[in-house]
Amino acid sequence: MNKLVKKVYGVGVGVGDKKLLTLKALEVLKKVDKIFVPVSKKGKKSIAYEIIKDYVDGKNIEELLFPMIKDKERLKKYWENALEKVLKEDGEVAIITIGDPTLYSTFSYVWKLLKERGVEVEIVNGISSIFASAAALNIPLVEGDEKLCILPQGKDLEKYIDEFDTIIIMKTKNLNEKLSVIKNRDDYIIGLVKRATFEDEKVVIGKLDEINFDEFNDYLSLAIIKRFKR
């Protein structure tokens, strides 16, 4: 008879600082029978695992390979391979992810497949890079009736720049080009954060022509664009 995992937890482990790991996440990680750790390449260090490793000494750990490629058909094979690994486990397991499992997370793809198989899934929230970056910049994201927009890689920024008070851009590669839509405007300020809450965190806030964007051309960088109300 084929085994079917009893329960799967999608656990957000935050963004870097181990002290930001939630009590609920620690509770789940300590009680599960196995912890699955997503990696983008075999042999590559997992940021998520580095965050939790001091708390899970002696636990059963297994890697899940999710390469950083855009071809969804190729990626689907890796998701399905991960699913089969998870399904064959007895008891309860956790799949960890940096940030929060509900926001641009690798876990969401496996979540869909698990739900299709009728597996019980519970999501354990983690602190997202969005909130960690706002804290690093020491600014509120939105207040009152202000509107917030999240854009992956700044896609279609020109469509939303005048509609929202705050725009979050996840993954800031080639951001300088995308921000040309506000080049000659003085009603916006830009905050950039690289590796929020890590020891080598880098933060800058200012106008477009005051920022060296090359320093933030990184997978773990994020931009917050805020409009001033006159």
Swiss-Prot record:
UniProt EC number: 2.1.1.151
Keywords: Cobalamin biosynthesis, Methyltransferase, S-adenosyl-L-methionine, Transferase
Catalytic activity: Co-precorrin-2 + S-adenosyl-L-methionine = Co-precorrin-3 + S-adenosyl-L-homocysteine + H(+)
Domain of life: Archaea
Claim: Lipid metabolism is one of the keywords in the record: no
Family: Belongs to the precorrin methyltransferase family.
UniProt-listed PANTHER family: COBALT-PRECORRIN-2 C(20)-METHYLTRANSFERASE
Name of the protein: Probable cobalt-precorrin-2 C(20)-methyltransferase
Protein's organism: Methanocaldococcus jannaschii (strain ATCC 43067 / DSM 2661 / JAL-1 / JCM 10045 / NBRC 100440)
Organism lineage string: Archaea, Methanobacteriati, Methanobacteriota, Methanomada group, Methanococci
